[in-house]
Amino acid sequence: MAKIRIHEIAKELGYDSKEIIEKANELGLGIKTASNAVEPEIAAAIYEYIQTREIPEAFKKNIKTPTAKKPKKENIKEQEKLNESEKKEPKKEEKLKQEVKKEELKIEKENAKEEEKQEIIDAHKPQSLASATLAKRRGLVIVKKKKDEEEIQVKKEEVKNSNDISINNEERLSLKTMFSNADESLKKKKKEKKSFVASKKESTEKMNFLDEHDFGDISLDDEDEVVLPDFSVKEQEKPQNINKKQPNFIRQAVGNSAGFGLEGGIQRRSRKKPSKKIEKKEVEEVGSVAISKEIRVYEFADKIGKSTSEVISKLFMLGMMTTKNDFLDEDAIEILAAEFGIEINIINEADEFDYVKDYEEETDEKDLVTRAPVITIMGHVDHGKTSLLDYIRKSRVASGEAGGITQHVGAYMVEKNGRKITFIDTPGHEAFTAMRARGASITDIVIIVVAADDGVKPQTKEAINHAKAAGVPIIIAINKMDKEAANPDMVKTQLAEMEIMPVEWGGSYEFVGVSAKTGMGIEDLLEIVLLQADILELKANPKSFAKASIIESSVQKGRGAVATIIVQNGTLTIGSTVVAGEAYGKVRAMSDDQGKALKEIKPGECGVIVGLSEVADAGEILIAVKTDKEAREYANKRHEYNRQKELSKSTKVSIDELGAKIKEGNLKALPVILKADVQGSLEALKASLEKLRNDEIKVNIIHSGVGGITQSDIELASASENSIVLGFNIRPTGEVKERAKDKGVEIKTYNVIYNLLDDVKALLGGMMSPIISEEQLGQAEIRQVINVPKIGQIAGCMVTEGVINRGAKIRLIRDGVVVYEGNVSSLKRFKDDAKEVAKGYECGVGIEGCDDMRVGDYIESYKEVEEQASL
């Protein structure tokens, strides 16, 4: 067997290596360092010596030890007399022993509390071998007899009639019997003790130390000591400042029941790093556990006080394959909570840095004033939304938009009867769904524009659904009433089918016929808007900190990040510290929709602000805060949260999703760098481009941003194979153009969104595999088969349909079944080679590689035509 080092023995016993070396040298072994190795038999002897304080027989000859006192002759005689008396009266003595045992157990229970206190005190003191005055056997305690134990002394005096008590062989058997009787009750108590509270530091767990141990060799020389079974072995928490370990007798008993020096050998400790012992702690019963919406498996296990393996195995039983780093969705969290019987409260960690939630609106009635209503104009493309707003503003915005369609969200202020009204103009193109939804969510009233000559269209229905979802009042403006084809009743009927019933038909929706060209009905429309605003009683507190919605954001040369906003509450002034998502800063300048400088923006009004640290996302809420530090903290926390969320996306997939992922990897992709003038347009373009895909091709947007095309964009495009740069409403500068030319990067710029989408579709179509179709050329019937040496078969044919061309692809058809496909190797008319033979003529046809032609077969000639695929 392999030798055992001293430091391994020290670890096993829980003592310092120096103390083990001292004891080993007392046996005359001459150990110098903790790395010295000894034979297993010597190691067993060291264990026995440290535990029993008795020198093994093999070492007694070499060591001069003080001679042990011989037992007195009187004691020997008394023992012999006692043995004789036991033989004569075994029954009487057995009863006396049982009575002694019962009394001793009572005393042990009475002194249990004192012993526990003493053990706790001793546990905090560093132990040494020198302090061990008497060998303490596993599972045994030595109880000193007290003066007040008179009853026990009386009982023992009866036994002492045959001189002093000394445990003989029969007594040893009775001790074993006592232990075996207590074994079953001990196991029951262990089961009851399993449910205990975690806050209790000291475990009262009892140990089954009786199995496979021989207690027959126990004897005592001291008549004032009684051996009792120790049923209250406790695992006490070690103080943090104590480094020395307690003797690990339990491990020895479990690992090798025979122990050192006995039959069974020595259990060698592994050289692997010792695993960290996790103290068993029961979970305190709590009313509810707060669980984050986005939580990993190991974090969830820690929250509920379970091990990660328990949670993973539970998920496995529920049919979910997860690892400890995978995120759990809300359904999985609720299912696990039910499985573990725990009440949970799902929270959103984003609430911790939700500056909108922290914003307090003043509710003092004295400070509330009527604010300007916010009106959003929505509808289908080309139904005249912007033209209608132009007439109201007396401007020409529509003519300035590329392609005659609105591609930006605009906010404008107008006055009617001395009252201000804020209008939001939204795009009608299908690509701008997010813009329309954003406009509906921050508005007070929605005007749905429908062309009288065109009726309800898809974007009309979508706009109505957005307005209904936002829960805002709807006013229907039937535009183009000046046209001859105008049919307002058709519009009313179509909208009535969507549960938009006119007031004149008994409904609750106002319908106004207008003409953006002539101005018909515009005044009536504004009157209805103001009337509806009065009904809503729109009020705000201009004295509080400002709260606004970002309608649009962009980067302007010389000004940096700018944002179009509508103030909902409070007053925003120059110098105000603001935060909007990940952007923050001080308002350096403000202007209205016509470019005039402003000093403040009141509730319900719109304007453009300059001073944000970066381009804020359209739709973000902007809040004014007290200090720059507060704004920076909010923005940084939001940025870090979003970053961690992006980096920690789970990569797990279900079996069903795995096939889709593999298929996704086989897709061809068109790498694109996308730049736009404003955030809203960029958002619309990204959404539209991501939809341009099929089972073979897709668009891969490797980078997108607001602002002009930069040299870094060109560098990124050059690093990506076959990538192009797409610009919307922006133009590259001279340096960027030169750089792109040097790098071979293609830049395409557009000012109309559907032109950009059409070009990208064409590019994707060119990358797709062509569509191959067949064009039938002709058919011929075989009337004679001629075998030509060294050439093969030649078919004498009559062309029955179309033409047969030399080199064309053919099929040999027999009884309606294709038996061979190949090419025409030779075509002759009489003895001359022919390029083609038309219908009604005879010819000789040789088929490449075919020697199985028969009379009555048909030869079908065709060619393959390739067509470019398109999305």
Swiss-Prot record:
Region (G3) residue spans: 425-428
The yes or no answer to whether the keyword Cytoplasm is present is: yes
Compositionally biased intervals (Basic and acidic residues) = 73-101
| CDD domains for the chain | IF2_eIF5B, IF2_mtIF2_II, mtIF2_IVc
Where is the stretch described as G1?
Answer: 379-386
Q: Binding positions for GTP? A: 379-386, 425-429, 479-482
- Coiled-coil residues: none
Q: Which GO terms describe its molecular function?
A: GTP binding; GTPase activity; translation initiation factor activity
Entry-linked InterPro entries: EF-G-like_DII (IPR053905), EFTu-like_2 (IPR004161), IF2_II (IPR044145), IF2_N (IPR006847), P-loop_NTPase (IPR027417), Small_GTP-bd (IPR005225), T_Tr_GTP-bd_dom (IPR000795), TF_IF2_bacterial-like (IPR000178)
Q: Where is the tr-type G domain?
A: 370-537
Note down the stretches annotated as region Disordered: 60-101, 184-203
Q: Where in the cell is it found?
A: Cytoplasm
Which GO CC annotations does the UniProt entry carry? cytosol
Q: Which UniProt keywords apply?
A: Cytoplasm, GTP-binding, Initiation factor, Nucleotide-binding, Protein biosynthesis
Query: What is the purpose of this protein?
Result: One of the essential components for the initiation of protein synthesis. Protects formylmethionyl-tRNA from spontaneous hydrolysis and promotes its binding to the 30S ribosomal subunits. Also involved in the hydrolysis of GTP during the formation of the 70S ribosomal complex.
Q: Which family does it belong to?
A: Belongs to the TRAFAC class translation factor GTPase superfamily. Classic translation factor GTPase family. IF-2 subfamily.
Name by which UniProt lists this protein = Translation initiation factor IF-2
